[in-house]
Amino acid sequence: MHEVVLYTRAGCHLCDQVKATLARLEKRGGLSFVWQEVDVDSDPELQQKFNHEVPVVFIDGKKAFKYRMDERDFLRALVAR
């Protein structure tokens, strides 16, 4: 099971797009991943680290995407891990 973390913040339209993509893929089923959303503004260290990079997606602890991600690219990255 792959672990996916989406670093995001309120009011970020690109974050909303990536979140919708992950939710759609999760709902579709058949993929071996779980995901969680983390608000970078909830932690000063995360805010400093990702302030200008959200959304950022990590798969199994490794940065896979920042700013944009589509279904096809996510599926490729998931299979490559």
Language-model segment annotations:
Residues N51-V57:
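Structural micro-motif
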Residues M1-R24, R28:
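Local sequence-structure signature of Cys/Sec-based thiol-disulfide redox active-site neighborhoods
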Residues S32-P44:
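Thiol-based oxidoreductase modules, predominantly thioredoxin-like and allied folds used
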Residues I59-R81:
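Non-catalytic, surface beta->alpha helical segment in thiol-disulfide oxidoreductase systems
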Residues Q17-A20, E45-K49, M69:
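Generic recognition of short, well-ordered alpha-helical segments
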